[in-house]
Swiss-Prot record:
Keyword Cell cycle: no
Family matches, as Gene3D superfamilies: 1.10.10.200, 3.30.70.980
Organism, as annotated: Pseudomonas putida (strain ATCC 47054 / DSM 6125 / CFBP 8728 / NCIMB 11950 / KT2440)
UniProt record, GO biological process: regulation of DNA-templated transcription
Entry's Gene Ontology molecular function annotations: DNA binding
Record's protein name: Probable transcriptional regulatory protein PP_2550
Localisation: Cytoplasm
Main location: cytoplasm
Source domain of life: Bacteria
Keyword rRNA-binding assigned: no
Pfam families assigned: TACO1_YebC_N, Transcrip_reg
Amino acid sequence: MGAQWKAKHRETAANAKGKIMGKLSKEIQIAAKSGADPDMNPRLRLAIVQAKKASMTRETLDRAIRKGAGLDGDAVQYHAVSYEGFAPHQVPLIVECLTDNINRTVAQIRVLFRKGQLGASGSVAWDFNHVGLIEATPASADADPEMAAIEAGAQDFEEGEEEGSTLFITDTTDLDAVQKALPEHGFTVTAAKIGYTPKNPVSAASLSAEALAEVEAFLEAIDEHDDVQNVYVGLTE
């Protein structure tokens, strides 16, 4: 839960998939602004990995790349913005957004933070590590995550979000190199991005059931906003 919070969606599978595709399309478009060739654009290459994992169609993927790179006209004008603050019960979080209207997004985020506390830039980021996050699954039964982390150049590793997966943590500048090296050491990369891990997370066990439910409800409301791409939370199980 500390690396990236994921909502326990109560919506239909179709609606959930639609939101995921919309967020992935935005990320591809903004990444493609730096070039449409994934071999020369690490951010785009990583976004494509995420899109393929989510079963985005080739047509949708190509359209997002062309739109972002401006190959069919003007390039898309999405802006990356982030917000910092606290969920109820002083649980720190960083919210990353992609938006075509910053004023609209900040106004809506302020409303969502009424049950928490929206902070100034830097008010929470100091309590997180800015890192590369690579989720990977073993390609064989004898794949060793510790050896793979050492050989591929990762800083650390821990259990991943998906069952049986490993989360490799890297320096931000090493993300692309490590995710390219992991297959040589027995792991298949399923997701890779620049993100955050908490330094001093709040323990969920220290919260009452009612308090934890309030935190979860707050985080789910944030995550469901159309402009929100990632939510990083200082909370451990």
